[in-house]
């Protein structure tokens, strides 16, 4: 959901909402890149105070963290070169492809469950680069990220997304016992009621995926 702009600043729906939440708390936000596969360890080890970047609310995540209410609907989608899109319109057609997936992601879980060949990489953006370079045949990433980064008018105009593999919800995770969960849920309700959440979603093309906050 997030990426760096030309000035090296983190932007995106999650990043902008996190900045707003930090402002409400009266603190400075710091964005730390982590190994997504180790996100629970990073959180428990206090490398970070929360996990907030398109995190799927899986049973494993909800058991390991105190999580916010869901704020976005999402799905995992298959990314392929646009010129080959017609060949890959069903799950069955994906057999034999070599996939790039973010390690520890919902995308990796989906590809593994289907018994498809995959190579874990550090980030979803790296998975896109693998396909663009021809190192991998396809990738599986979040549909919200795909909408922002793939296709006409993006840096990956020669790629497109085809098959949707599942549906899921995004949430924010904090360490067990954190009082920030209630604070964030309240912030989501306020931002949704004020329309600022929708404005932010419009900016990054994810308005249709927003979950009503109440």
Description of each model-found segment:
Residues 15-16, 30-43, 86, 103-105, ...:
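Short helix-initiation/N-cap motifs at beta->coil->alpha
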Residues 16-24, 82, 103-105, 169-208:
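Extended ligand-binding regions for polar small-molecule ligands
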Residues 26-28, 45-53, 97, 132-145, ...:
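Alpha-to-beta junction loops
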Residues 1-54:
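Extracytoplasmic small-molecule ligand-binding "clamshell" domains
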Residues 73-80, 143, 147-189, 207-214:
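Periplasmic-binding protein-like
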Residues 38, 54-64, 110-113, 137-166:
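A ligand-binding cleft/hinge motif common to bilobed small-molecule-binding domains
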Residues 2-7, 18-27, 91, 104-124, ...:
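Ligand-binding cleft/hinge of the Venus flytrap
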Residues 68, 81-98:
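Flexible hinge/capping segments at coil-to-helix
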């Amino acid at each position: 959901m997030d990426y760096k702009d030309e000035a090296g600043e983190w932007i995106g729906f999650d990043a902008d909402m996190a900045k707003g939440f930090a402002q409400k708390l009266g603190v400075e936000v710091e964005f730390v890149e982590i190994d997504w596969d180790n996100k629970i360890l990073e959180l428990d080890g206090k490398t970070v105070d929360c996990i907030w970047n398109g995190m799927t609310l899986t049973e494993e995540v909800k058991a390991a963290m105190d999580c916010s209410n869901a704020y976005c609907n999402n799905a995992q989608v298959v990314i392929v070169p646009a010129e080959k899109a017609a060949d890959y319109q069903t799950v069955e057609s994906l057999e034999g492809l070599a996939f790039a997936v973010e390690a520890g992601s919902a995308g990796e879980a989906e590809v593994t469950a289907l018994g498809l060949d995959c190579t874990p990489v550090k980030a979803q953006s790296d998975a896109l680069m693998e396909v663009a370079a021809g190192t991998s045949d396809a990738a599986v990433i979040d549909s919200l990220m795909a909408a922002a980064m793939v296709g006409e008018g993006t840096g990956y105009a020669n790629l497109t997304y085809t098959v949707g593999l599942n549906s899921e919800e995004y949430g924010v995770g904090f360490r067990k016992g954190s009082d920030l969960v209630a604070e964030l849920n309240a912030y989501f309700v306020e931002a949704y009621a004020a329309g600022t959440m929708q404005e932010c979603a419009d900016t990054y093309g994810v308005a249709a995926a927003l979950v009503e906050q109440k």
